[in-house]
Amino acid sequence: MPKVSIVLPSFNGERYIRESIESVVNQTFTDWELIIVDDCSTDGTLHIAEEYARKEERIKVIHNQENQKLPEALNIGFRHASGRYLTWTSDDNMYLSRALEEMVRYLDKHKEVPMVCTGMLFMDENMQYMKEFISYNSVQMRVQDTVGACFMYRREVLADVGEYSREFFCVEDYEYWIRILIKYHSIGYLPYNFYLYRRQKNSLTIEKADRIRRMNSLLHCRYFDWCIAGIRDNPEYILFLYNQLLADNWIDEVKRNCFEEIMPALKAEKALDDKKAVVIYGAGQNGERAYECLKEQVLAFVDTNPLKAGGQKCGLPVWTLEELKKYYDNNRHQVLISVRAELQLEIIDSLMEMGIPQYAVFARIS
């Protein structure tokens, strides 16, 4: 019985799957089994997988007669896994040679930890370095997946938290990590890069990006109490979650009351009034997108960047804060904050100090 089971699901992955398989075969740790799940590919994926299985007895191949999509393909693979430790990888990514060895060593040493993840590097299609993945952050996990693609967990985890959810296709891994954190309260982290994550051009279509965004919102709505409990003292993450759920209409009265209790300044965040002119706070890309949505209702922009303030955006003036204070009329105007969530807190505070009683955030119209 192998110590580690690796599941490799693939659908039409013939272009890079050899590199992915070779990265497993070339591991310094050798007590593994690789279970390749061909998810009804129409290219040469199955042929390549079977070629490797004939040469290497540690490799098994499962062929799905119908396409099951990633969550169920993973579940099928793990139902055939016999290892003490479990992991999975993708057909276009690669382990560095010591990845399995180091993760096994960590789990062997830290018996209390259910799972470990490591750093990884983003690469382009030709495996040229692009950038380093953000480090695992247990607090940030409440609003964003920071586990990455190199990880390993104990077989008991599968028994305790169950299989991957088909409902959360596209964010099935993040949802699984949340269940692990709810059950065990921690995930171990090795601050070394043991994985190469290939970012292919045009691989993230508009439709897929939109689904990921919607699934993340649904995920945070489903686990709202857990998410909010871990970020009550972090206003930037509170605003991130608020904006995300607001954009997808997931904020009901209960959630709004919760947000306002934690951050009273959100009581002033209101829907836009069609009868009032809009001043867009933020003359960047989000500000331009806001203008495209509102057009004739927009009076001006506001920005603290000296390179933008005093100029024009979309044919309208870009005010300084002093000009906003001078020209703003509560009866005729309203402010739409159109910057990233992590920049909103300072703006909200400045509006309150200026006596502007309410505002809206861009998520309301995005």
Residues covered by each model-derived region:
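Conserved nucleotide-sugar donor-binding catalytic segment
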Residues: R79, S135-W226, R232-I238
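A conserved acidic beta->alpha catalytic loop
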Residues: T30, D38-H47, E66, S90
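Cell-envelope/extracellular polymer assembly enzymes that use nucleotide-activated donors
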Residues: P2-S5, E33, E175
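Short aromatic/hydrophobic "clamp" motif used to bind/position activated sugar donors
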Residues: L86
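Short, acidic, metal-binding catalytic loop of nucleotide-sugar glycosyltransferases
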Residues: E22-D31
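Glycine-rich, basic loop-to-helix element that forms the pyrophosphate-binding segment
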Residues: N64-A81
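Conserved donor NDP-sugar-binding/catalytic core segment of glycosyltransferases
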Residues: R98-M130
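Hydrophobic, well-ordered beta-alpha structural blocks that scaffold small-molecule cofactor pockets
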Residues: I231-S366
